[in-house]
A protein has these predicted regions:
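Active-site segments of SGNH/GDSL-like serine hydrolases
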Residues: 76-77, 110-158, 162-163
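Catalytic His-Asp segment of secreted/periplasmic serine-dependent ester chemistry enzymes
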Residues: 144-221
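Short, well-ordered alpha-helices that flank and scaffold nucleotide-derived cofactor binding pockets
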Residues: 26, 30, 115, 195, ...
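Conserved SGNH/GDSL esterase-like catalytic core that processes O-acyl groups on lipids
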Residues: 6-12, 17-104
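Structural signal for conserved beta-strand scaffold positions within catalytic alpha/beta enzyme cores
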Residues: 38-40, 141, 169
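Soluble or luminal CAZymes and related metallo-dependent hydrolases
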Residues: 48-54, 98-109, 148-152, 209, ...
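Short, flexible hinge/linker loops that cap or flank conserved catalytic cores
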Residues: 2-4, 133
Length: 221
């Protein structure tokens, strides 16, 4: 199906868990018959996304006009909620962002996207020109691909509740949990579906999931 015939356009921001060599996002877009715009870059953090947005190079004005859903999958195991560290006006944040405050960077990205959508009502070149409130801003958040990153997973749930955003709960729907070891390997099941491992609180877990559209975990996601 050509992009012109697809009714839904989805923009993804993320890092190594979301880059195109994974496949889950592209598979999801194919299933939805949606046009996917994958702007995930391995090694980036939410601070980098905020900086790209501040420069105006995460998406063009034309792309913003067409995007129906903005998906954020920045899943470093950090607190992304922390309400006491946030600014009411996103213009008050010092730029460029560093990686010292994940909650502030998330707050900037969310408020900046909502504001960009709102401003389209004043843009004569936009299909939302003259529409009260501009374009409805639809943001979709994601947990980590499994439940071991507790700090992030718990705080992204709070952020989702705060804003009323839908949340993709990979950690609840992936098919295994950190609470139970694999009965044969006596290790975390996530290690069977990962290319490498990471240690959290003294336990070894799967880190980067096996990549490629033919991989089980990418299809599960």
């Amino acid at each position: 199906m050509s992009d012109e015939k697809k009714k839904l356009t989805v923009l993804l921001s993320g890092a190594s868990f979301a880059s195109v060599d994974n496949g889950w996002f592209e598979l999801g877009c194919e299933a939805l018959r949606a046009k996917g715009i994958n702007r995930a870059i391995g090694g980036e953090a939410i601070a980098d996304v905020a900086n790209r947005m501040s420069r105006g190079d995460l998406y063009s004005r034309e792309e913003l006009d067409e995007v129906d859903v903005f998906v954020i999958m920045q899943v470093h195991n950090r607190d992304v909620y922390a309400p006491n560290e946030l600014k009411k006006d996103y213009h008050e944040y010092a730029l460029p962002f560093t990686r010292g405050n994940y909650a502030a960077a998330f707050d900037y990205v969310i408020k900046k996207y909502i504001s960009d959508c709102y401003q389209l009502q004043f843009d004569k070149g936009s299909k939302y020109y003259g529409v009260k409130g501009g374009k409805p801003a639809v943001i979709l958040l994601c947990t980590h691909w499994h439940d071991a990153r507790v700090v992030y997973n718990e705080s992204i749930r709070k952020l989702s509740d705060k804003w009323g955003f839908p949340l993709v709960k990979f950690d609840e729907q992936i098919g295994f949990s950190k609470t139970v070891e694999h009965p044969e390997t006596h290790r975390q099941t996530s290690t069977l579906f990962a290319d490498d491992t990471e240690c959290i609180d003294g336990v070894e877990y799967g880190w980067h999931p096996n990549r490629g559209k033919d991989c089980y975990i990418q299809n599960r996601m």
